[in-house]
Amino acid sequence: MAIRLNHSVIPVSVKLGAPTRVSARSSLPFSVGDWRGVSTFSGARPLVLAKVKLRAESTEEDRVPIDDDDDSTDQLVDEEIVHFEERDFAGTACVPVYVMLPLGVIDMNSEVVEPEELLDQLRTLKSVNVDGVMVDCWWGIVESHTPQVYNWSGYKKLFQMIRELGLKIQVVMSFHECGGNVGDDVHIQIPEWVREIGQSNPDIYFTDSAGRRNTECLTWGIDKQRVLRGRTALEVYFDYMRSFRVEFDEFFEEKIIPEIEVGLGPCGELRYPSYPAQFGWKYPGIGEFQCYDKYLMNSLKEAAEVRGHSFWGRGPDNTETYNSTPHGTGFFRDGGDYDSYYGRFFLNWYSRVLIDHGDRVLAMANLAFEGTCIAAKLSGIHWWYKTASHAAELTAGFYNSSNRDGYGPIAAMFKKHDAALNFTCVELRTLDQHEDFPEALADPEGLVWQVLNAAWDASIPVASENALPCYDREGYNKILENAKPLTDPDGRHLSCFTYLRLNPTLMESQNFKEFERFLKRMHGEAVPDLGLAPGTQETNPE
């Protein structure tokens, strides 16, 4: 008997007892010779490979029982199995890789935090040919106390450090609060003077049906309302971006800053803050609509009157709570009100507000950064993707139910402004999600496929980043598959990838070796250990 793995035929001696069905979840407990066990790494799911000492012959004592739910069998493995299927990316297109710097790399006093340690880490990144880093420029730090008084001093010091090492800088215009979401390890609020306005006019914030105000970012209802000390939200965003462009002119002229990512909502993403942890949301809750501030409600009422049904100028009343399931609601269940005449009207309006906000802010960004590439981030709402309503996407503002394409119109808006689309969750596997949360009916792979193709069909650049920390080969291989699709007839690929994020765990020896290997493959370089498990090497039988 022989096993063919990664184009290599490996002889295996197997001694079987009674026929058996081996469960996919069954472990393979090898105890013969020099057992090394089933290889796992950094919390990833085990690869199906094992390493067993070579033997000239087997004895009855070497027989190893393999337990199964329904039956058992005896099996012998007489050869090392160290290969697994892994695609060779040598010679493929180079996809630049950037690394996000820590969220709190600049403190509230506009000083670089632990600059010597940071410099050492940046040198290490440069040594493995990372293309650059991503830096959040926080509105709450730079324009903290007084309108139109900007303090860029800490960022200037940081950018000079990065420039001296020959790294590029992706800059994020971060108009949102940091803190309270998954992965946030610092708390940076929006500017103090804006929060003072919010105390007397809380409708400047997104609001849910219970009247809870979300202070992560400003509601899109005030984009054109002069409620911020005589300025509209759009004017505030433009003035901030223009100040940055003037202050860092030399970095633009030297092409140190090749791209600006513009924050369009919570976490810098173009979405409603529909699943806030601060209000008790837990995965995989469907979230709630966030349109109950007076400005968005006035917009909804006006849209209903134009439609000729003024009684539609209200939010749905049967969507339940943040942690509900679609089938537990009258609105999102199969055949629910989401697909009624009113439901379609409401969802059209709700998603149009999102697209119009992106349209307006990206237009301002192109004015501020004329001649520089701009980008914006779209979140990967992959839970409940396998249901008809796609409830979690609907509450986030993506009208992507099973009978609609919710991402084509967004891609068309990006195309209008020649903006790149940055998408998350490219490292996630649908099978993993099904094993961990089968009730969520998630499909991150299907979502990534839909969004990437919507963007490519609109002829806009597509960048990406991982949604959760990733240190293992399996996650990196999934990113590579999405970055350079094997079956794409046009050879399309990501314009760049941004790794989340620089931290002590990444810098650990084995994790950094895996990252360096991933980086080479993203750059289209050959790696010597293709098809081998991490930490193993080819061995020759004696």
Swiss-Prot record:
Its EC number is 3.2.1.2. Redox regulation; active in reducing conditions, inactive in oxidizing conditions. Keywords: Carbohydrate metabolism, Chloroplast, Glycosidase, Hydrolase, Plastid, Polysaccharide degradation, Transit peptide. This is Beta-amylase 2, chloroplastic. Disruption phenotype: Normal growth rate and starch breakdown in leaves during the night. InterPro entries: Glyco_hydro_14 (IPR001554), Glyco_hydro_14_CS (IPR018238), Glyco_hydro_14B_pln (IPR001371), Glycoside_hydrolase_SF (IPR017853). It is an enzyme of class 3 (hydrolase). GO terms for molecular function: beta-amylase activity. Induction: Slightly by cold stress. Substrate binds at D136, H176, D184, K377, H382, T424, N466, A467, R501. Belongs to the glycosyl hydrolase 14 family. It catalyses: Hydrolysis of (1->4)-alpha-D-glucosidic linkages in polysaccharides so as to remove successive maltose units from the non-reducing ends of the chains. It comes from the Eukaryota. It comes from Arabidopsis thaliana (Mouse-ear cress). Optimum pH is 6. Residues 1-55 form a transit peptide. The keyword Electron transport does not apply. The gene is BAM2. GO terms for biological process: polysaccharide catabolic process.
